[in-house]
């Protein structure tokens, strides 16, 4: 097991030091340039699509639409009043 680990470590170490292999693929300025280009493209795409304010992709609708009926639901009350009497550490019981 130790021999296998050492062999893999040496192979990776050798590959990193030869030109045109893993060391060349890890060119930091090039990867930073790609990241900056990706961010520029992303801002351009979002500018072209113009997503309206208040839109959330998680709900798939506008916040104003989902919160529109919130004040109306506060007006509704149960036709009867339920009184819950709870004691610490015990289950609650319903007394009408």
UniProtKB/Swiss-Prot annotation:
Q: Which residues form the signal peptide?
A: 1-23
State the Pfam families in the record.
Bradykinin
Location in the cell reads: Secreted
The entry's note on the tissues where this protein occurs is: Expressed by the skin glands.
The molecular function GO annotations come to: hormone activity; toxin activity
Main function: [Val1,Thr3,Thr6]bradykinin: produces in vitro relaxation of rat arterial smooth muscle and constriction of intestinal smooth muscle. May target bradykinin receptors (BDKRB).
Q: What is this protein called?
A: Kininogen-2
